[in-house]
Amino acid sequence: MKLLMTGLLASAAVAAAQEQQVLQAEGSAQQQPAPSIFDETLKQFESGLEEGITHFWSEMKTNFKHYLPLISVPKEHTRRADSEWDHVVRGADVESVWVQGANGEKHREIDGKLQSYDLRVKAVDPAELGIDPGVKQYSGYLDDNETDKHLFYWFFESRNDPKNDPVVLWLNGGPGCSSLTGLFLELGPATIDKNLKIVPNPYSWNSNASVIFLDQPVNVGFSYSGSSVSDTVAAGKDIYALLTLFFKQFPEYATQDFHISGESYAGHYIPVFASEILSHKNTNINLKSVLIGNGLTDPLTQYPQYRPMACGDGGYPAVLDQGTCRSMDNSLERCLSLIETCYSSESAWVCVPAAMYCNSAIIGPYQQTGMNPYDVRSKCEDMSSLCYPQLNTITEWLNQKSVMKALGVEVESYESCNGGINRDFLFHGDWMKPYHRLVPSLLEKIPVLIYAGDADFICNWLGNLAWTNALEWPGHKKFADAKMNDLKIVDNKSKGKKIGQVKSSGNFTFMRIFGAGHMVPLNQPEASLEFFNRWLRGEWR
């Protein structure tokens, strides 16, 4: 779904720790000393850290016992026997295949370390769940048997021409939000009503493409593990293995164009995942482009745009008063200095304080208003459902035993977003890292689309426009100088309707989508399918 507010504020972590303490019976709080490795590592780094960062980590050490309950824990699960699956693809078998090149040299048919991976596949009966009857579906798990990681996926074939239509991987953000929220809340073939009934979605992205929805990293949605993944780079090799084994099992899709799409924290994921795929010479993944919606990709350039978006300069009325806006301005210099230090070292020891300070000083004032951080036009009625009560309905439907059985699910329960994963990534310094630095190398090989609903605060269109204009790459000047043009519907009965603005140069495209919040397909389903279809057909690239 979205960039989780759980990890956004320094006060959020502290509040959670305090709440944990309050809920304990009086006198039951256990005083646990911080692990000695924490003291030793901090001592090694103290000489190189500025005073403010050293003070931050000293406080963390003092309160370390409060943060331990916040780290994600493994899920209860029962692994089904391989004989219960329709297909099992062994990574070791794929890795063992060698072929002879045109000049007689031998090389592996498919690159990558695949030996520890398996892919389990179940053919899902559409009639059993009532979702997209007549459309071929598969679900299952990618297993990394070496590290006990199991990623859940759900594949929907194109409604139109699956033999020729492209294949798209969809990733939600968080970090820690299930891509099944994107399936049922945004762009999948169906939604769930309050009576737990299936409602078909005429604007599903599988109208003209086959779509894979993936729960990642581990312990998100229906995925599980005895260990954890706490940074974006660590997840990249899993994605490569999943796609490689999936296309090996289903070669009919491997020859078609493949695209990676996602939103929010996928602004971190996608540059890394695409770079991992493109780093392999011999592969069965035909990657043609990437699409990032309302993403967090370059914090140093995006964070200065929070104040303008909250204070009336983003096309919507101001949410904050002038005094609060001035306070955000006063905090910005310190915030940017911390992010610059993070960019220089990429060490958690400086990246964590940068995220904690900036999220508290720059994003915190907005959250305190009670407005929806994902849509400046509305209040947040229920923060426990991330301001979208529909998530509760989706979660209830997916937790039905009949649904889990039909999908081959191996965990005991489903939750839409895992706050523990969010905090894991935050406290490992992943939040503020400069993943935008990977984009120039992507642009050398494939087109990149950055789109943004213009009513979102948390990954707002101003910040996304700013970082795309600022990105250093050979086509920088032409892109930055390109004018924004009207984006209009051309594909259906709404032909001529203005849905946003677009600018494009070389392999780089930016879109502003009018009247949409953080989740563009939710607020503007017709507009989202319009630009999605046209992008896949090659327009603007």
Swiss-Prot record:
Its EC number is 3.4.16.5. It is an enzyme of class 3 (hydrolase). It catalyses: Release of a C-terminal amino acid with broad specificity. Disulfide bonds join C177-C417, C311-C325, C335-C358, C342-C351, C380-C387. InterPro entries: AB_hydrolase_fold, Peptidase_S10, Ser_caboxypep_ser_AS. GO terms for molecular function: serine-type carboxypeptidase activity. One of its GO terms (cellular component) is fungal-type vacuole. It comes from the Eukaryota. Residues 18-122 form a propeptide. It holds the Pfam family Peptidase_S10. Residues 1-17 form the signal peptide. The active site is at S264, D456, H518. Keywords: Carboxypeptidase, Disulfide bond, Glycoprotein, Hydrolase, Protease, Signal, Vacuole, Zymogen. One of its GO terms (biological process) is proteolysis. It is found in: Vacuole. Glycans are attached at N208, N507. Vacuolar carboxypeptidase involved in degradation of small peptides. Digests preferentially peptides containing an aliphatic or hydrophobic residue in P1' position, as well as methionine, leucine or phenylalanine in P1 position of ester substrate. Belongs to the peptidase S10 family. PANTHER family: SERINE CARBOXYPEPTIDASE CTSA-4.1 (PTHR11802:SF113), SERINE PROTEASE FAMILY S10 SERINE CARBOXYPEPTIDASE (PTHR11802). This is Carboxypeptidase Y homolog A.
